[in-house]
Amino acid sequence: MARACPSLAWQLPWALVAGLAQAASLAWPWGGEPLWWLQLASMAMLAWLLRPGADRAVAWHRAALIGGVFATAWLASTFWWLFISMHRYGALPAPLAAAAVLVLAAFLASYYAAAMGLFCRLAPLHRAGAALLFGACWLLAELARGSLWTGFPWGAGGYAHADGPLRVLARYVGVYGIGAVAALLALLCVQWRRADLRHWPMWLLLLAGAAALALAAVQRTCAIDLCDTPPPWRRDPTLSVELLQGNIAQDEKFRPGSGVALALQWYGQALRTARAQLVVAPETALPLLPQQLMPGYLEGLARHYAQGPQAALLGIPWGDQATGYTNSVLGLSPATGAMPYRYDKHHLVPFGEFVPPFFKWFTARMQIPLGNFNRAGVGQASFAWAGQRLAPNICYEDLFGEELGARFIDPAQAPTVFVNLSNIGWFGNTIAIDQHLQISRMRALEFERPMVRATNTGATAIIDHRGQVTHQLARHTRGVLRGQVHGRGLDAHSGWAITPYAWWVARWGLWPLWALAALALAWAMRAQRMRRARGA
């Protein structure tokens, strides 16, 4: 006779602990590194709470509650630093700022609550297919969080695997696919540990065979080499870079008498004295609109880079009251002349860069400058320089791999180097810096493109195409990071021009992952109907 499920008073604290462990796995608070094994352990704990025995699964409504507690703890302890931007820099009262973080975490956790409830409603009790369904439900929740209501996928479980064995999957299925595989493996481990899988070696072989067939189909259909190593006779040119980190205090950054003057003086001098082929200054390094700058300031920089063998990318707000404002990157080089290259940010930060409908009352209580930008398009042109195609992205835009992937629709014009310009100073000296670094590393793995990062306070770094940090500047210091970066994919006809992930995400976005998850759900519902018919 099956035993009753454990009480909620016992399950919910463990769900809370598992959620906290999931958050810590993304960037360990005492070192900043991702811990893939801790993420798997936290997922295994969640799976065990949902299926406490070989012949027992919790009721769907209890599963939803467990999943909601797990996800709320995970998300709130992942982006708790939003409190700093709202309270310290936005002057929002501390209780209201803390409540806002918790409400956001609980709202996003509702996707996981629904997914876990659906899993326990549909999953078979004795089959390894339950692991497949668990991975599919987890994938649906991650996709919903990353896509709906502008999307906020910060802290997705797959980022914990930037250094783990599952990192090899990034070039095929991206961070969401890695998270789904981790969920599948977590439930398989739980079932294997208690002998719930009567024929588990056969199931694992079937899963491995299906994965191999899928990869072979991708290689044949897309004409993409699945090997990461480039041909030995092919070597892309090296680009020397200088990445500027001004470390302008966030509470001074937009004050005319202090931070603004310091930023204009320091960045102006650094941009003029740099010697590298490419110089990058971070997001809003120049914290004034062009028409607010002292006469000749921007024109002087443009003339400097028009005369020498150098180029610069620098962050600056752009526009006017008539046309609207954008958070932009300006590109200066001998080729641009009087018409500099410009990239405008597409994925704006809710409440910080635009006001969502019905929330003006909330943003009115905060004192955040530059808070109402226009949104630009996806897939903007790259900045061509020194034989490279440089693709800027601003702030947390590198969180959305599907949007970066839009630039890979034509391999001949695909980026060879990603350039991230950020200002994480809004969130203080917190784990947000390390989390953002892991996000950039995952993008480098997915597209096999190096990522250079110029930030106000950190992490200013150079990441190679294998996701390894090769150079990094000390956080919260003022300085210049010098290094070399090797662009990738200059030859559009070589087998390693783009990864499988870049190929399919450029064409269909995240829809293939949505479709795979939906197919798994359809299979589970059909299997459930068949079981009920046999029972009748």
From Swiss-Prot:
Which GO MF terms are attached to this record? N-acyltransferase activity
Predominant subcellular localization, coarse grouping: membrane
Q: Does the keyword Cell membrane apply?
A: yes
Catalytic residues in the record:
283 (proton acceptor), 345, 395 (nucleophile)
Keyword annotations for this protein, in alphabetical order, are:
Acyltransferase, Cell inner membrane, Cell membrane, Membrane, Transferase, Transmembrane, Transmembrane helix
In terms of PANTHER family, this protein maps to: APOLIPOPROTEIN N-ACYLTRANSFERASE (PTHR38686:SF1)
Under SUPFAM superfamilies, the record lists: Carbon-nitrogen hydrolase
Q: In which pathway does it act?
A: Protein modification; lipoprotein biosynthesis (N-acyl transfer)
Q: What is this protein called?
A: Apolipoprotein N-acyltransferase
Localized where?
Cell inner membrane
Q: Which family does it belong to?
A: Belongs to the CN hydrolase family. Apolipoprotein N-acyltransferase subfamily.
| GO CC terms of this entry | plasma membrane
Q: What NCBIfam families does this protein's entry cite?
A: lnt
Q: Name one GO biological process term.
A: lipoprotein biosynthetic process
Q: Where are the transmembrane segments?
A: 34-54, 64-84, 89-109, 129-149, 172-192, 199-219, 503-523
Its gene name is lnt
User: Which membrane topology describes this protein?
Assistant: Multi-pass membrane protein
The positions making up the signal sequence are none
Superkingdom to which the source organism belongs = Bacteria
In this protein, which residues make up the domain named CN hydrolase?
244-487
User: HAMAP family from the entry?
Assistant: Lnt (MF_01148)
The EC class name is transferase
